[in-house]
Amino acid sequence: MKILVTGRDGQVAQSLAERHGGHELVFAARPDLDLADPASIERTVAAVNPALVISAAAYTAVDKAEEEPDLAMAINGEGPGVLARAAAKTGAPVIHLSTDYVFDGSLDRPWREDDPVAPLGVYGATKLAGEQAIAASGAAYAILRTAWVYSPFGGNFVKTMLRLAETRDALTVVEDQHGCPTSALDIADGIMAVAAAWQTDPAHGANAAYHLAGTGETHWADFARAIFAESAKRGGPVAEVTGIPSSGYPTRATRPANSRLDCSRMANVFGYRAPRWQASLAEVMDRLLPENAA
C-alpha cells in the first residue's frame, strides 16, 4: 500500500521509516508539501495518489505559538483540513496525529477520547482546530492523540536531559505535571496497526479519535530520573534531579497538569497498546548510547 507521510523530518515520520510494515512510504515536507500553502498540499497529494495519508507534520513549538498564533493555526488548524480534503478526492483515509494539549489537565484520572476539550494555549487550540477540520473534511479518518513524545530522532526531552547532564551535575525539573512518556517508535507501531486493520476493512474504527501513549504514568522529574538511571547503566551522562513546582519554571504557554491518556479504545478497536514506558525508554536509550548498551 502506498502511504503519504507528512512531516518527513519529524520523530514520528523517521520512526515510520523503520516501522513501515512493508508498505511503500512516500515522505513529504516543505517546500514540496507546506501545510501553510494549500496549493502545495493539493499538488503533492494528487501527484502521489496515496492509498492512505498519515498526517504527522505540525507546528510543535508550544511557547513560540503564543507569539505566532496565525502561523500555528495555518499549519496545525487549517493545513490538516486541506490535506484531508485532498485525500478525500483520491479516496484515501487519513491518520492524523494530535495531542494531549487539547485538554486542560483538570481531571484527576486519565483522559478519555470523549472528555470535554478545553485547550489552555494557542498550540492546543490550533491542534483542536486541526482535529475538527479533519472530521469535517469528508475523508475517512482516525485521530491519534499522543503525549510526551521522545525517540532517537530530532529534539525531545530525553535528548535534552542527556545534553544538559554533560555540563551540569544537578538539574531542576517540574514534578506537578503528570503524563505518559511515549516513544515515537511505538506511535509508528500503533499507526501501522490502524493501517493493517483498514486494509482488511476500511470502515473498521473509522471516523473517531483514539489515544496512543506509553503505558503507565509519571511526572517530568521522575521521567528525568529514569533517563539518568538508564544512562548510568550505559556509562552515559547523569545528573541529580530536584523536583520543583511548575511555578518555579514559568513558561509562556501553560501546560496541562494532567496529560495522562486512557488508551483503552485503541487497544479494544485496533488491538494495539504501547509497551510500558520504562521498556520503551530502555529501547531508545540503547539507540542513543549504543556503545555502552546494557
Model-derived segments and spans:
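Active-site loop of classical SDR/Rossmann-like NAD(P)-dependent oxidoreductases
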Residues: 11, 219-220, 244-263, 276
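NAD(P)H-binding glycine-rich loop region in Rossmannoid oxidoreductase-like domains
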Residues: 38-77, 86
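NAD(P)-dependent short-chain dehydrogenase/reductase
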Residues: 135-180, 184-193
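Catalytic helix-loop patch of NAD(P)-dependent Rossmann-fold dehydrogenases
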Residues: 74, 79-82, 89, 102-144, ...
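Amphipathic terminal alpha-helices
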Residues: 275-294
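Mid/C-terminal beta-alpha module of Rossmann-like enzyme folds, strongest
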Residues: 190-191, 197-251, 292-293
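Adenosine-cofactor binding site in Rossmann-like domains, unifying the SAM/SAH pocket
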Residues: 21-43
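N-terminal Rossmann NAD(P)H-binding glycine-rich loop of SDR-like oxidoreductase domains
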Residues: 2-20
